[in-house]
Amino acid sequence: MVRRLSLGTIAAAALLAVAVQQPAQAQATSKPVGCNLAWCPIHVEVVKNAAGAEALRVSFDEIRMAPKHTGATLTWKLMGSPDYEFRADSVTAKGANAASAAAQFPLRLISANEYAYDNRNNNALKYDYEVRVYKKGSPAGSTPLVSNGVVVNAN
């Protein structure tokens, strides 16, 4: 009994060590998150994808806001990526409802490491957005690393 427990513990420790040593990889999709708080952080990180190219990993690509919880602040935070920055167009609405997004999500903050909108959304429309992160010092018009997401009022 003790021997099996020890072998199981050793196997679990070995798997944990392997998982910790693997480099960060870009995720194809992430789980949706429900945001019922006054502040909803979304972590953004530059990582290497399976081919070795730089890509964005975003903690949540679908943000579900409680329909009666307007006034929350959605904040994208650039983490662990000192060679990259947010710029004026780093979180941009796109798709069918892009034209009405500015009224539903007024801009709160733009900095090199944070980008935030206030949620005033009171309808059931889906708002698609694109996150863009730029290499620091790159000229205007440079190609950013891009990730897509959606914000929707949902239970």
Describe the function of each predicted region:
Residues 1-11:
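Bacterial N-terminal signal peptides that target proteins for export
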Residues 9-19:
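Bacterial N-terminal signal peptides
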Residues 20-26:
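Sec/Tat signal peptide C-region and signal peptidase I cleavage site
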Residues 31-70:
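N-terminal edge beta-strand
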Residues 43, 73-77, 128-130:
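Beta-strand secondary-structure signal
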Residues 64-82:
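Beta-strand cores of secreted/periplasmic/IMS beta-sandwich domains, seen most often
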Residues 83-103:
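Short, surface-exposed alpha-helix to beta-strand junction/turn motifs within ectodomains of secreted
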Residues 105-155:
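Extracellular/periplasmic metallocenter environments
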